[in-house]
Amino acid sequence: MAPLQPGDSFPANVVFSYIPPTGSLDLTVCGRPIEYNASEALAKGTSVLVAVPGAFTPTCQEKHVTGFIAKLDQLRQAGVDRVLFIASNDAFVMSAWGKANGIKDESILFLSDSDTAFSSSIGWANAGRTGRYAIVVKDGKVVYAAVDTVRGSTEKSGVDAVLTVLGNQGKL
C-alpha cells in the first residue's frame, strides 16, 4: 500500500495492541493487552493518529506527546474526538508511557504497532520502528497525512501542524 493521502479511506483491518487505563498512574500496575480495532474506531468522528519512533525517546517525549497533551483542549475545541499515539514499543511500554505523562483515562490512547505492520503497510516505517507521522481521519476518510523525514522534526506531525489543518478546514 502507498502512503495515505487526503481523500483516501482509512484502511480496513488495522488493529493495534492496547492496555486500557486502570485509573492508576502507578507504573507497577499492569493491565492486560487487548486488541484495539482502529479501523472501526476511526470510522466515526474525528481522530488524530500520531506515530512516533519510540516511547520515552527525546523528540517523542519532549516535543511530540507533551505538545498534544498541552493542547488537548484546543484539539477538542477543533472537533477532535480521539487522539491515538502509536509506536513500535509493546503495549506494556506504551501503557507506562501514558502513565508517565499523567494520562490515566482515555483522553489520549497509547497503542502498540509492535511489528510495525500498519506503519510498514503505508510506507512510513523506518528501520524496524514506526516513523514520525500524523494522520487526521474524519468519519473513516483521511483529511491529512504527513510524515516528518528530518530527524528530530515534528514540523508536519506535531500538534501545531494538526491544529493548523483543523483550523484551515473549519471544524471538519
UniProtKB/Swiss-Prot annotation:
PROSITE patterns: THIOREDOXIN_2. Its main location: cytoplasm. The active site is at 60 (cysteine sulfenic acid (-soh) intermediate). It catalyses: a hydroperoxide + [thioredoxin]-dithiol = an alcohol + [thioredoxin]-disulfide + H2O. Conjugated to URM1, a ubiquitin-like protein, in response to oxidative stresses. The attachment of URM1 to lysine residues exclusively depends on the presence of a peroxidatic cysteine in the target protein, with low specificity for the particular residue, motif, or structural context at which urmylation can occur. The URM1-conjugation reaction is mechanistically and directly coupled to the process of cysteine persulfidation, transfering the sulfur atom of the URM1 thiocarboxyl group to redox-active cysteine residues in the target protein if it is exposed to oxidative conditions. Persulfidated on specific redox-active cysteine residues. Persulfidation (also called protein S-sulfhydration) may provide a molecular mechanism that enables cells to protect vulnerable cysteine residues from reactive oxygen species (ROS) under stress conditions. It is found in: Cytoplasm. The active site is a conserved redox-active cysteine residue, the peroxidatic cysteine (C(P)), which makes the nucleophilic attack on the peroxide substrate. The peroxide oxidizes the C(P)-SH to cysteine sulfenic acid (C(P)-SOH), which then reacts with another cysteine residue, the resolving cysteine (C(R)), to form a disulfide bridge. The disulfide is subsequently reduced by an appropriate electron donor to complete the catalytic cycle. In this typical 2-Cys Prx, C(R) is provided by the other dimeric subunit to form an intersubunit disulfide. Homodimer; disulfide-linked, upon oxidation. Belongs to the peroxiredoxin family. Prx5 subfamily. This is Peroxiredoxin AHP1. It comes from Chaetomium thermophilum (strain DSM 1495 / CBS 144.50 / IMI 039719) (Thermochaetoides thermophila). The lineage of its organism: Eukaryota, Fungi, Dikarya, Ascomycota, Pezizomycotina.
